[in-house]
A protein has these predicted regions:
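Non-transmembrane "mature" sequence context
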Residues: 1-221
Length: 221
């Protein structure tokens, strides 16, 4: 369960290794939105630079990530809301985090997202998933070439999926998840559905995201 002052480790990917939760984020709805926010922010490359793992779900941590997101031009309104509300109010934090999660889901930031996803998935798999040659992916990663809008949208969608999967899998498991056939995808692997010049609005990619989101829902209960 997410709720409560103590929790089993629910994430093992990179820096987020949550073991406890503090008020007011110990309310189930607040904890759920906060975990989702941190998961997505990490996948998008929005965690503040630090060598330390994040082991406690608390207001200080969430506020720091909100500031990092706002500095990247994302979720500025959510940060303003956080600054204007009583930070001891769990319901207020639910509102702030719902708005922050919507903002993260709607705002591709490829320059921040390429490095973390390349480390997580490997450049070859990531290039395949976003529909570009590995050489092109390396140029986008290095900043030698601007990421085209269509590629940025696909990269963002992969990051959202990876954030959802991080509630259930480690790095190896996430990479393997993309390659395993799924009955919910008519026997195809997610990597087969996410092939070529797809769009996040297409039915197949949306089905892949739904499949990943169900795993995040399960990890939160």
């Amino acid at each position: 369960m997410i709720a409560g002052h103590h929790m089993d480790t629910i994430r093992s990917v990179t820096r987020i290794r949550l073991r406890s939760v503090e008020e007011p984020l110990d309310r189930p709805a607040a904890a759920w939105e906060a975990v989702r926010f941190l998961s997505t922010a990490e996948a998008l490359g929005l965690l503040p630079a630090s060598p330390e793992s994040i082991e406690t779900l608390d207001v200080r941590t969430v506020r720091a990530v909100l500031k990092e997101a706002a500095a990247a031009g994302v979720a500025r309104q959510a940060l303003a809301e956080a600054d204007s509300r009583d930070e001891r109010d769990a319901d207020a934090w639910v509102d702030v985090l719902v708005h922050a999660n919507v903002a993260l889901a709607d705002c591709p930031i490829p320059d921040r997202t390429w490095p973390g996803l390349a480390d997580l998935l490997g450049i070859d798999l990531l290039a395949k998933l976003v529909g570009v040659a590995p050489a092109s992916a390396r140029r986008y990663l290095a900043g030698d070439r601007a990421t085209p809008d269509a590629v940025a949208a696909r990269l963002h969608w992969i990051a959202l999926i990876a954030g959802d999967l991080a509630g259930s899998y480690n790095e190896f498991g996430i990479r393997r998840w993309f390659s395993r056939a799924r009955s919910q995808l008519d026997g195809k692997a997610p990597a087969d559905v996410l092939a070529g010049e797809w769009s996040p609005d297409d039915q197949g990619p949306r089905a892949v995201r739904t499949l990943a989101t169900r795993l995040l829902d399960a990890a939160a209960t």
